[in-house]
Amino acid sequence: MTRYEKDVIAWADEQAALLRAGSFAQLDIERIILLVERAGTAEIGQFYHAMSLVLRHLLTWEHTAEGRTKKLRTLIIVRRREAIKLLRRTPSLSIWLAKATFWQDAWEGAVAERRASGKVTEPYPATCPWTPSKVLDEGFFPE
């Protein structure tokens, strides 16, 4: 049997074949459990990244009147739709929007990205001024 560390593709093929054959005793159970747990973590990470990007672009929109270009509007729409698509594909992600730490971390990530651009001098609020539902509202563009 191929070890996961040696050849992940061969290992996965073997594990799938064992599952199909009902040979459960031969499965690499601990590794499979770990990978299943990581699958959920990866989805949460993708969602965090998507929300942080939407927030960053909304911050740019709000704080740079001259920067309210068609390109930025399109970026907001595209990133927002990516976040919504993730929510549709994995509805349980919505519970993360209610978690204060998730939302605060996404906000702080967005603010840090804006500050790293070097174009920002004004301070931002310590917490996000918009609700998750507002951020995901396709008609919302802050003034």
What are these regions (language model features)?
Residues 1-143:
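Surface/interface-facing alpha-helical segments and adjacent flexible terminal/loop regions used
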